[in-house]
């Protein structure tokens, strides 16, 4: 009798397949500020968060509030950050996108006003303000997609810090192993044809081949539902 394949085991929700969120430092959210006002804060430390690839900044605001924010390029310990409608449009400040000039780079963008920031949060990425209309602002996302947002949505001016991360090779499998331990993923990932017959429908045999058709019905049972699921066609397009 075969064993449960990885896709079945993942559904059980054991710690192997769950993100270690107890190690994550905080949910990074823009501070709430009254309209037509702004507050200033000072960066007292730059830290690493296992939850993300970009560094985070510990900021103490003039109200006494201490908050962790996503760090942008150019931010250092001792830098001053402004947040609010009256804040200057300069790197690191949190301002409404409706007040950002066209062509400026922004990151950590809100989807709705005061939701804290949803888009463009990975290291080294940025979006570009394209144009403004009376009640909406067009922003070019890193994917190239144009997204229309409420001009009251806030964003950080500049580029997320930590750029160039994807250009650096891992060099050692141990480095990749420790990185994957912070994610909800199983590493290393073994192909089905390299497994034993009890572990996967494509396992076993004298050499690495599935040994059976790789197309499978949409209604196949969970242990067999691997390969090209409900494929309309297979092979090279002619």
From Swiss-Prot:
Keyword vocabulary terms for this entry: Ribonucleoprotein, Ribosomal protein, RNA-binding, rRNA-binding
SMART domains, per database record: Ribosomal_L2, Ribosomal_L2_C
GO biological process per UniProt: cytoplasmic translation
InterPro entries named in the record: NA-bd_OB-fold (IPR012340), Rib_uL2_dom2 (IPR014722), Ribosomal_uL2 (IPR002171), Ribosomal_uL2_arc_euk (IPR023672), Ribosomal_uL2_C (IPR022669), Ribosomal_uL2_dom3 (IPR014726), Ribosomal_uL2_RNA-bd_dom (IPR022666), Translation_prot_SH3-like_sf (IPR008991)
Domain of life: Archaea
Pfam families cross-referenced by the UniProt entry: Ribosomal_L2, Ribosomal_L2_C
One CC-aspect GO term: cytosolic large ribosomal subunit
This protein's record includes keyword Transport: no
Region of interest (Disordered), ranges: 203-223
SUPFAM superfamilies associated with the record: Nucleic acid-binding proteins, Translation proteins SH3-like domain
NCBIfam families found in the cross-reference section: PRK09612.1
Family membership noted in the UniProt record: Belongs to the universal ribosomal protein uL2 family.
Self-association and partners: Part of the 50S ribosomal subunit. Forms a bridge to the 30S subunit in the 70S ribosome.
Known function: One of the primary rRNA binding proteins. Required for association of the 30S and 50S subunits to form the 70S ribosome, for tRNA binding and peptide bond formation. It has been suggested to have peptidyltransferase activity; this is somewhat controversial. Makes several contacts with the 16S rRNA in the 70S ribosome.
Name listed for the protein in its UniProt record: Large ribosomal subunit protein uL2
Species per Swiss-Prot/TrEMBL record: Methanosarcina barkeri (strain Fusaro / DSM 804)
Gene: rpl2
């Amino acid at each position: 009798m075969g064993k449960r394949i990885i896709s079945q085991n993942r559904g059980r929700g054991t710690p192997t397949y769950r993100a270690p969120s107890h190690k994550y430092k905080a949910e990074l959210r823009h501070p709430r500020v009254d309209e037509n006002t702004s507050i200033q804060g000072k960066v007292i430390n730059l830290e690493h968060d296992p939850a993300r690839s970009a560094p985070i900044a510990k900021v103490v605001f003039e109200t006494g509030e201490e908050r962790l924010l996503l760090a942008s390029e150019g931010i250092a310990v001792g830098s001053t950050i402004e947040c609010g409608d009256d804040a200057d449009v300069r790197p690191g400040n949190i301002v409404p996108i409706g007040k950002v000039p066209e062509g400026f780079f922004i990151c950590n963008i809100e989807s709705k006003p005061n939701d804290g920031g949803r888009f463009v949060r990975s290291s080294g990425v940025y979006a570009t303000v394209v144009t403004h209309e009376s009640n909406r602002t067009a922003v070019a996302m890193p994917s190239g997609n144009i997204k229309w947002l409420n001009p009251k949505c806030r964003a950080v001016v500049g580029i997320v810090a930590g750029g160039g991360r994807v250009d650096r090779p891992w060099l050692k499998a141990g480095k990749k192993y420790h990185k994957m331990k912070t994610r909800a993923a199983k590493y290393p990932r073994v192909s089905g044809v390299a497994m034993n017959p009890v572990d996967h429908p494509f396992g076993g045999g004298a050499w690495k081949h599935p040994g059976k058709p790789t197309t499978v019905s949409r209604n196949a049972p969970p242990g067999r539902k691997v390969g090209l699921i409900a494929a309309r066609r297979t092979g090279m397009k002619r």
